[in-house]
Amino acid sequence: MTCYRGFLLGSCCRVAGGRAAALRGPGAGGPAARPRLGGDGGGRRHLGQGQPRELAGCGSRADGGFRPSRVVVVAKTTRYEFEQQRYRYAELSEEDLKQLLALKGSSYSGLLERHHIHTKNVEHIIDSLRNEGIEVRLVKRREYDEETVRWADAVIAAGGDGTMLLAASKVLDRLKPVIGVNTDPERSEGHLCLPVRYTHSFPEALQKFYRGEFRWLWRQRIRLYLEGTGINPVPVDLHEQQLSLNQHNRALNIERAHDERSEASGPQLLPVRALNEVFIGESLSSRASYYEISVDDGPWEKQKSSGLNLCTGTGSKAWSFNINRVATQAVEDVLNIAKRQGNLSLPLNRELVEKVTNEYNESLLYSPEEPKILFSIREPIANRVFSSSRQRCFSSKVCVRSRCWDACMVVDGGTSFEFNDGAIASMMINKEDELRTVLLEQ
């Protein structure tokens, strides 16, 4: 074992001790043939029984089927691969990695098993495509770039919701389909993916694409403009930052190089679109976020809070839902107070409490195709200086001026932009940014 490897294992011991071919269908014109896309181009589940309320009536019926020629498959990085990459410079053997994971309370065999399940399902997807004469490129996060997206007629995200968000982040062409396949249904919810039955029967999904037996779901996304003084439009990949600080340092160096500029820069359209949400707040969660906010070009309001979340209909069942949802305990307490204050003879049984709770929580969800933003203020501070007139509200445009010291603006949990004092972010929905996805029946 090298000295560095020994140092890593030794450090963990001390911590542990302290704690105890071308893609073409029938009639395609060859490898270079472009896809025939159905549909009219307008317009964190699926049609059929048990379909969530927020997707009821969504999507446009495909017309003529969908036959792409080239597909890029974006495969997620499994936890096993992530741990290998974290310690790649230490040159750990598999046995060393096993010991290191055990010291951290993680199961090496469990991670390896999930990795094999994911890998097997990715191979199933690729084999299914190639059996149809499809030209396929398999890429990981680091290899997934704009050139790869331009090459492909369609993008398949092989993983879970996080992989779907990654795959969508590079696709700015509203006509290019992005399809999610859950490669580990036992461990991943996969709200944005095809129904789990297609994980092991992907050829059936392909045949439905060919026959047009699906609907297009046009998911709205948030576009972001950044302007003001000392802004840094260089994005930081938070996944890569976990593995290495090099990228983050490069972004900081670029920021420092421009830090001396006092003049304000005009609005810059950022090269990402938010499919789920945008979060704005101090990097240190224990520090209050100070900012000014304007909704739909209204007056500016100074606020302090734990940050704010701006989501789409797609993201309304993700982080935003968990920020705003209420528990049955809170509903029961409120109803009891209302009963006492209003002298109501309301039968407060468990059935009523759960019904009220569910109806309120379901009201937080809306269709991914609706062109509106739901912004939520997290834990707003209310005193004689600061207030929040609206803790949650639908809007078409939100502008935020930072008064923070070390804040960030995070898009879909994966891409971060510095957002400090003087920076102004404008967020809105534009039809050109909608993402073309697929709805298949269960």
From Swiss-Prot:
Inhibited by NADH, NADPH and NADP(+). GO terms for molecular function: ATP binding; NAD+ kinase activity; protein homodimerization activity. Disulfide bonds: none annotated. Keywords: Acetylation, ATP-binding, Kinase, Mitochondrion, NAD, NADP, Nucleotide-binding, Phosphoprotein, Transferase, Transit peptide. Signal peptide: none annotated. Its EC number is 2.7.1.23. Residues 24-60 are annotated as: Disordered. Residues 24-36 have a biased composition (Low complexity). The modification N6-succinyllysine is found at residues 76, 302, 317. It comes from the Eukaryota. GO terms for biological process: NAD metabolic process; NADP biosynthetic process. InterPro entries: ATP-NAD_kinase_N (IPR017438), ATP-NAD_kinase_PpnK-typ_C (IPR017437), NAD/diacylglycerol_kinase_sf (IPR016064), NADK (IPR002504), NADK2_mit (IPR012355). It is linked to 2,4-dienoyl-CoA reductase deficiency: A rare, autosomal recessive, inborn error of polyunsaturated fatty acids and lysine metabolism, resulting in mitochondrial dysfunction. Affected individuals have a severe encephalopathy with neurologic and metabolic abnormalities beginning in early infancy. Laboratory studies show increased C10:2 carnitine levels and hyperlysinemia. PANTHER family: NAD KINASE 2, MITOCHONDRIAL, PTHR13158. Mitochondrial NAD(+) kinase that phosphorylates NAD(+) to yield NADP(+). Can use both ATP or inorganic polyphosphate as the phosphoryl donor. Also has weak NADH kinase activity in vitro; however NADH kinase activity is much weaker than the NAD(+) kinase activity and may not be relevant in vivo. Homodimer. Belongs to the NAD kinase family. This is NAD kinase 2, mitochondrial. It comes from Homo sapiens. The lineage of its organism: Eukaryota, Metazoa, Chordata, Craniata, Vertebrata. The gene is NADK2.
